[in-house]
Amino acid sequence: MTELLPAKATFAPGESIVVEARGVDGAVRLVHLDRVVAEASPDGGVVSFAPQPEGGYGIDADGASTAVDVLADPLTRPRYGFVSHYEAGRATDGVAENVRRFHLNAVQFYDWMYRHAKLMPPTEEFDDALGQRVSLATVRRLVAAVSEAGSLPMAYAAVYAVGKEAWPEWKADGLFRRDGSPWMLGDFLWNVDPTSERWLAHFTADLRSTLEVGFAGFHLDQYGSPKWAQRADGTLVDLVEAFPALIDRVAADVPESRNIFNNVNDFPTFATVGANQALTYIEVWAPHTTLAHLAELVTKARLLGPDRPVILAAYLSAYQGDEAAALQAEKLQLATVFSHGGTVLLHGEEAAVLTEAYYVTHKEIAPETQDAARRYFDLAVRYGDLLFAADDVTRTHLGGENEEVRIEAPSPVATDAQAGALWGRVLRVPDGLLVSLIDLSAQANDTWDAPKIRATPIEGVRVSILRRGEVAPRLAIASPDAPQLAALTPERSERYDTVTLPAFDTWALVLIRDGAA
């Protein structure tokens, strides 16, 4: 097997870039966009490059490629993973390798805790609230392994939940419906008022007590409902106001932690985006059912918080069925979110994807499926300098009355996600334009969580750029299956420079520089 595997999910400025070279004998190249920055040969199965400026890089050898990024703060380009099993004696190597392979620079430790209102356990081994056996020693070892792999271990914590054993203590601070019944999740968790000073003091102290495990921060969860509720005395609690205040309180009381709050189904992103947290995280549910909805969620979140990276948690229940059809759905999801400047929470454990909100019941996937998905993450990391610093100019440059960019294909071309079409978008990037092409031509719908028809490479796509000066622009193409930017030779007409693209599967990026506007 030939593989290039970064030593870390993300490297820090001033840190040497170290890559495992498995089965690689020849030269290994470090590339920024289309410029070879350095070249080295493996020594003892490892390649090392000198520290590099912040940004995304490709790493290529004959028969293998990967990507790395150099970031002072990993959460400026987050790639979120998960772990959810902590049995005694569990090995950690597989999780660490998956973190490195998918460049997962933050990992959620889902349901690692003793109880929702008492995170640290009374004993080293215990059963969690749903009966899963947990070893705190295993949690510690996984935290250490994830950290060593260049990732931030994030402890799951629900912001307003208590179990049956704690409800009598907290009932006076409970959240109730108008008929007096308590708000609950299922039949085992009761919601408490997140504005209660008694609860806030307890909650932040409970969070602080977990830092000795080695966590870098917290995944602050809520359940989407209620959006408003009553206290026992009839006082109305508005969660739109309560959640940002809680986030800020956690940041003030546990200032050394990095925090991620779950905006369930986009509620209340408009309010929490200004709170003191690392990024904007949205767990996606109906009625956000289409690829267009995923695109809208990322776009809106970036507009609300321009300096906040965006993560979508869009669980693929399609993986409970045919894996090939689910992989195609994943490819379309990743292409959509990455090309809009967001990232996703989907991969984790040793080789698993999330199919529902209870992470313990994740789905293990085949090595070939994992490898196909990894190539999409590689592309997003390699070209992060373009994808995460882009302005969408599709509506002013492509389609309709616009003349700046033209796309021809064997199928219809659309500027929105449309089943049966090639979805084209134009992004303004430093020094030029980036055209994103997502192939939906074989699909009957654009539902993101539905099995998809496996795409065959689309051929005969032509991209034309309106000439701005005498010098022809430089055009190059990259895709998950061919990640190195490959130069394209344009044909010149009176007004346009046109290239015919090589066939590509599902997603391609065309970079246009020098003369593009």
Task: Walk through the language-model features, giving the residues of each.
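Carbohydrate-binding surface patches
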Residues: 407-469, 508
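Extended acidic/polar, glycine-enriched regions
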Residues: 26-27, 33-76
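C-terminal beta-strand-rich structural cap/linker in extracellular carbohydrate-active enzymes
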Residues: 492-517
